[in-house]
Design a protein with these regions (language model features):
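Bacterial signal peptide processing site
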Residues: 17-20
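N-terminal secretory signal peptides
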Residues: 28-73
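C-terminal motif of bacterial Sec signal peptides marking the signal peptidase cleavage site
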Residues: 12-15
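Short Fe-S-cluster ligation motifs
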Residues: 98-121
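Short, exposed beta-strand-loop hairpins at the edges of beta-sheets
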Residues: 117-130, 135-138
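Envelope-exposed proteins and targeting segments
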Residues: 38, 44-46, 53-55, 78-82, ...
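Mature extracytoplasmic domains of secretory-pathway proteins
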Residues: 56-98
Length: 139
């Protein structure tokens, strides 16, 4: 009888360790290293440290996404707004657009530009907040 109780406790314990968000592993790559002049991708909640400086960019998430779905023909491309926390030269928050201005921000002597945002919307389905990946370039 005792082995059954131990096995049941094992199942309960491992069941409590599953990720709360479907499709995620519960872990993100640690802070990535970004190079000036090169594009890099950053996931929601992830940080990128700019090589050769103290500047750190953290992708907070997308606050608004009205981009045209890939399976629809639109008269306007739409716009998405991505939020970032910036640190290393004082604390700052930045909202950067995909289509409208500002498409970049100045911080710590650098220009941080949003050059892409994935995934592309599809009609009839919302993008889960944690699935966004921003492509940035710092000059």
């Amino acid at each position: 009888m005792k082995p059954i109780v131990v096995f049941a406790m094992f199942l309960v314990a491992t069941g409590c360790m599953t990720p709360s968000q479907p499709g995620t592993t519960g872990t993100l790559t640690p802070t990535i290293q970004a190079e000036v002049g090169r594009e890099f991708e950053i996931a929601v909640g992830q940080e990128a440290k700019l090589q050769g400086s103290n500047v750190v960019i953290r992708f907070r998430g997308v606050t608004n996404d009205s981009r045209c779905p890939s399976d629809v023909q639109c008269v306007w491309a739409g716009n998405a707004v991505a939020g970032f926390d910036l640190s290393g030269a004082g604390q700052s928050e930045a909202l950067i657009n995909t289509t409208l201005d500002p498409k970049s921000v100045s911080y710590g002597g650098y220009t941080i530009a949003l050059v892409g945002l994935k995934p592309t919307p599809k009609s009839g389905s919302a993008i889960p907040a944690l699935e966004y990946i921003a492509t940035l370039r710092v000059n």
